[in-house]
Regions:
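Membrane-anchoring alpha-helices and their flanking helix-loop junctions
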Residues: 1-75, 80-160
Length: 160
């Protein structure tokens, strides 16, 4: 990664990395086939709580990128958000594809959390402001609504 960043600017590297990640997520979604069901335990109460768990996941994902108090107080909000997202999906999906995809996301985010101290950047954090926490609440609410409304169109899996 550092070798690549000597040839191209950091912003371009991050943009290309993000595009490749989105492309990979699109390929995962396109390759989904519901006929590969396994006998995995489904926790019905998680289905009832899933809108709230996903709201929390979106909140922490957004909070990781804005200078609010959540980012200031929670050590790794993005790790927490991805963990909530992956575990919620694991708890409600009994098919092999979901277990492989969300299980891998969870394993990778746990590995990232365990190795995070070695990658700590010494960039000063901007002063936290409450306005960004309010903005995060609004964005997470809107994103939760949109994902729940359009989940079938976006990801090919209808929510029951």
């Amino acid at each position: 990664r550092q070798r690549i960043q000597t040839f191209i600017p950091t912003a371009l590297y991050l943009g290309l990395f993000s595009l490749m990640s989105l492309f990979g997520l699109g390929l995962i979604s396109a390759g989904y086939d519901p006929k590969f069901a396994i006998e995995a335990p489904v926790l019905p109460w998680v289905g009832i709580l899933s809108p709230w768990l996903m709201f929390a996941a979106f909140f922490f994902l957004i909070a990781a990128n804005v200078p609010g108090w959540t980012r200031y107080r929670v050590q790794h909000p993005m790790t927490l958000g991805i963990s909530l997202w992956a575990l919620t999906h694991l708890a409600v999906n009994p098919d092999l594809h979901a277990w492989l995809m969300f299980g891998c996301f969870f394993v990778l985010v746990v590995a990232s959390a365990l190795t995070a101290s070695g990658r700590q950047k010494n960039n000063p954090k901007p002063a936290p402001r409450w306005i960004f926490d309010g903005l995060t609440l609004g964005l997470a609410s809107g994103l939760t609504f949109c994902v729940y409304t359009f989940h079938g169109a976006l990801f090919g899996v209808e929510l029951s």
